[in-house]
Amino acid sequence: MTKVAREVVEKAGVNADKLLELLVKNASAELTTYYYYTILRANLIGLEGETLKEIAEIARIEDRNHFEALVPRIYELGGKLLDDMKKFYDISACPPAKLPENPSVQEILKVLVEAERCTVRGYTQICNMTAGKDHRTYDLALAILNKEIEHKSWFSEFLGEGSSGYFMRREELSQFVSKFLK
């Protein structure tokens, strides 16, 4: 599969090495975000924090699912994950979503929004690179992009940055990404 997948992608005009670099960096971002969202979620306390805890938990689990969905495509294209977790962390496409010094709900929301904005930019770049050329990677990146936009919107709305055009779906798996996890 690796040889054919890479050959098809390259014949379509996609730089497979650059694509793999982006996929691995975004996989790193998803896994590290999952880790940091665990810490952020644990610090969403009080009446206001408890209101957001479930939303942060859903975004956290979906980010882990995004990581799981990216891994097969990375290997299909002949890539691999780094075998050193520290190095894998260091190549993340996004800065760490660390708990702010002042862990108020507002400050945690700002961290969550910035983390989601970064992933939106990352998957937009992958979509732009693969649109009309690498249908499988494009489909995967677009599915994740749709979820990241939704996550960003959830958190942005709590900061009063946008209209409430999104709502949280109570599904076990993302309707966009679940087909890649079967």
Predicted ranges, named:
Residues 1-182:
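Iron-associated oxidoreductase/ferritin-like identity signal
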